């Protein structure tokens, strides 16, 4: 019950007539830029390997020190 290719073609022609090719091109480039920025932001949120290793080593060292202190007490 979807749209046939003829109906999609007519719909595309109507959209081009209403908005014009220049405005559609601008909308496409704006949408592409937004998607690119979103992907970049998602990748920036992931911790860097070096930072992650450093933090995990600090946590491990602190855990060992705490264990030694508990054993001595």
Curated annotation (Swiss-Prot):
It comes from Histophilus somni (strain 2336). The gene is tatA. GO terms for biological process: protein transport by the Tat complex. It comes from the Bacteria. Part of the twin-arginine translocation (Tat) system that transports large folded proteins containing a characteristic twin-arginine motif in their signal peptide across membranes. TatA could form the protein-conducting channel of the Tat system. This is Sec-independent protein translocase protein TatA. Keywords: Cell inner membrane, Cell membrane, Membrane, Protein transport, Translocation, Transmembrane, Transmembrane helix, Transport. It is found in: Cell inner membrane. It is a single-pass membrane protein. GO terms for cellular component: TAT protein transport complex.
